[in-house]
Amino acid sequence: MRICLVGVGQSVPGFEDIWFGIIEKGYKKVLRPDTEVVQRGLKVGLGNPLDYTNNYYTHLNLGSIVEAFIEAEKEGFDAAVVGCFDDWGIKEASAVVDIPLIGPGLSSVLFACQLGRKFAVIVANMPGIVPHIEEQIRA
């Protein structure tokens, strides 16, 4: 099985290697021997975390994530994952690709619902993030 892990920021030399390295340590522990994960940054989009609050950059970012999912399907990946709890692009890309798309936010919320009636989500202290996550959970 081949899975494409799509980062949520523009490819930045140095930072991307560090971020993907941290993520890789987590999934390598549970990855099946016959499964390959290919990590991808975006060609256009968020250049740094502060751009998160800029509507223009988030718009570019969303389009780039959807394009990355489309490319993953064309390249024969069996599934794709977005590398952010916000599940950027999952809903939009699901309308145009047939491969499974996985977002850690929805996956985590659904798992938490199996464990109990109440749960909490800890998020970054960034403008606009709390309403976004609340909307994501209600959906």
Give short role names for the model-derived ranges.
Residues Y56-N61, D78-A80, D98-P100:
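Short, flexible loop segments at the rims of nucleotide/cofactor-binding pockets, characterized by
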Residues V38-R40, V81-V82, L101-P104:
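General beta-strand structural signal in soluble alpha/beta enzymes
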Residues M1-H59, N125-A139:
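N-terminal glycine-rich anion-binding loop in soluble enzyme alpha/beta folds
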Residues S94-L115:
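Short, acidic/small-residue loops that bind anionic groups at enzyme active sites
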Residues V6, K74-C84:
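Periplasmic-binding protein-like
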Residues D87-K91, S108-V109, I129-V130:
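Short, well-ordered alpha-helical microsegments
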Residues T53-E71:
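Glycine-rich, highly charged phosphate/nucleotide-binding loops
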